[in-house]
């Protein structure tokens, strides 16, 4: 008898848990091209951050950290809510955008709400030269904690101290996991 062989192809995937969800509010008030740039930037971050955070149930829809001029929080926050707007910040040039977390959980030291403002006076030029998406990705990084939550000593129970030399001409990021990933990509420096 001839031997019998069989081949079967299959794909194995790892369960990374719940995905990262970035909810953008205020898109309907923006120029459609600008709104799309925000949507694309959020999708990019959601593809980079592969695991979401536990859902958060706020004790109040309007915690004291939430700015008065934004909508209340929903009954459940999954994972971060970002209110977006395009006010005139300083006119053409200079400040293109500004952003950061407004509500930070003491348990994770991560934001559940933040704000991004892109200077309306610069938005058309950034759309024309193709830089708007990168600027929004940069600002969204601040809402997610990059550069803004590296040191949480200002919080009552804040434990994170990832930035050495803050406020100097040579600040150094020293988070072990971040430095390891940076090195894994073949990068060097701080």
Which residue ranges define each predicted feature?
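Accessible peptide chain termini
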Residues: 1-2, 190
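C-terminal edge beta-strand
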Residues: 2-15
């Amino acid at each position: 008898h001839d031997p019998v062989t069989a081949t079967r192809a299959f794909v194995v995937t790892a369960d990374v848990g719940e995905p990262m969800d970035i909810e953008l509010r205020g898109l309907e008030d923006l120029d459609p091209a600008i709104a799309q740039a925000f949507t694309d930037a959020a999708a990019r971050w959601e593809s980079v951050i592969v695991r979401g955070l536990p859902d958060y149930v706020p004790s109040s829809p309007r915690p004291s950290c939430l700015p008065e001029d934004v909508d209340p929080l929903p009954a459940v926050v999954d994972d971060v809510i970002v209110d977006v707007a395009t006010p005139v910040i300083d006119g053409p040039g200079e400040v293109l955008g500004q952003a950061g977390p407004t509500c930070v959980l003491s348990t994770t030291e991560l934001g559940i709400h933040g704000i991004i403002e892109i200077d309306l006076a610069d938005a058309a030029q950034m759309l024309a030269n193709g830089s708007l998406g990168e600027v929004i990705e940069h600002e969204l990084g601040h809402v997610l904690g990059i550069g803004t939550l590296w040191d949480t000593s200002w919080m009552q129970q804040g434990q994170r101290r990832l930035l050495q030399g803050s406020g100097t001409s040579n600040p150094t990021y020293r988070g072990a996991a971040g430095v390891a990933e940076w090195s894994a990509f073949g990068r060097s420096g701080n």
